[in-house]
């Protein structure tokens, strides 16, 4: 039969961080016959590079479209995107990161959690500390002992307790 086998995650809070953890756990236990690819710029450097490179096509295309429409990159433009795992933000911004901030302003929007919850998944706006998550140093929501906090978000893809090491 064709198609992927979908394996639900029943560990932890059953969110994206747990799915990535289970994926990595399976991969390291089956390295001889398995390869893994993560759809976000998280985890060990090679996965960040693979995902970052593939999503950067979005930025290259945006640059082409801007030049086609305006004959150049506009003198003042804002590029806004959700930040979290990092793939869409990096993909959208990668060709513009080195531009002067006065010309191109990059705006990242972080999803929080439910208003009554203290489990907000917004590491950049909630004083996250540098930590290690999925084999990468990044800003992570963690407790005083360095343990990863549970997080919540209205969006399943934005409940990751850290940000991409690219951020």
Where is each model-derived feature located?
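Active-site/ligand-binding loops adjacent to catalytic centers
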Residues: 17-46, 70-72, 98-101, 108-167
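Buried hydrophobic positions in well-ordered alpha/beta secondary-structure cores of metabolic enzymes
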Residues: 23, 62, 79-81, 86, ...
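Phosphate/ATP-binding catalytic cores across multiple sugar-kinase/actin-like superfamilies
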Residues: 55-70
């Amino acid at each position: 039969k064709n198609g992927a086998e979908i394996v639900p995650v029943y560990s932890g809070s059953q969110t994206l961080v747990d799915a990535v953890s289970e994926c990595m756990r399976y991969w390291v236990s089956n390295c001889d016959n398995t390869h893994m690819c993560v759809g976000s710029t998280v985890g060990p450097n090679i996965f960040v590079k693979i995902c970052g490179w593939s999503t950067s096509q979005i930025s290259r295309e945006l640059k082409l479209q801007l030049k086609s429409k305006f004959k150049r990159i506009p003198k003042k433009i804002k590029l806004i995107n959700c930040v979290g795992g990092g793939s869409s933000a990096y993909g959208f911004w990668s060709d513009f990161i080195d531009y002067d901030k006065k010309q191109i302003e990059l705006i990242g929007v972080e999803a929080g959690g439910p208003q009554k919850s203290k489990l907000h998944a917004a590491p950049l706006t909630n004083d996250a500390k540098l930590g290690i998550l999925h084999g990468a140093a990044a800003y992570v929501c963690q407790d005083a002992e360095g343990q990863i906090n549970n997080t919540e978000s209205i969006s399943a893809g934005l409940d990751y307790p850290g940000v991409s090491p690219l951020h």
